Design a protein with these regions (language model features):
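Eukaryotic intrinsically disordered, low-complexity regulatory linkers and tails enriched in Ser/Thr/Pro
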Residues: 1-154
Length: 154
């Protein structure tokens, strides 16, 4: 069995009585009935040659798939470095976005239409690999045991 890392201090995971898995995240909320989960996956891939994406997907019998992911830059010197481009373009917008929505730009899913638009996909970005690993552990435990869980990132 894979060794489990300690969950970050800004996360909490506890059983609930609802037979649902619930995620309360800084950028939104997600809930699914446990009987509707058909598969759970955790995987990593390289995006545009310079970002490592680590992703947890939860597939359901409904019409949508949910993706939770964490981004890590591979190199700071690449001319395609999306992280630097986003930081440069968004420096003046961060404060206005947070004031208007209550969400930091760093917590928001970043898309390039139409390349990263996924029909019927709900997406959440997490800010650390530890948060993503804790989320995977929570949803997998709920699905495996049939007991609802509530996962929170503060």
């Amino acid at each position: 069995k894979e060794e489990e890392a300690e969950a970050p201090k800004n996360t909490a995971d506890e059983e609930n009585q609802k037979r649902r898995w619930i995620a309360n995240l800084p950028s939104g909320k997600y809930a699914v009935n446990l009987g509707n989960i058909t598969s759970i996956s955790e995987h990593s891939y390289l995006l545009n040659g310079n970002l490592m994406v680590t992703e947890v997907t939860v597939d359901t019998t409904g019409a949508s798939l949910v993706r939770f992911y964490y981004l890590e830059p591979i190199t700071d010197s690449s001319t395609l470095n999306i992280v630097d481009r986003i930081k440069n373009r968004s420096s003046g917008l961060k404060d206005r976005t947070r004031d208007r929505t209550g969400i930091s730009v760093d917590e928001m899913v970043q898309k390039t239409y139409p390349d990263t638009t996924h029909a019927r996909t709900v997406e959440f970005r997490l800010l650390s690999r530890g948060e993503l690993k804790a989320l995977y552990g929570s949803v997998y435990t709920a699905w495996d045991t049939g007991k609802g869980r509530t996962f929170n990132v503060k």
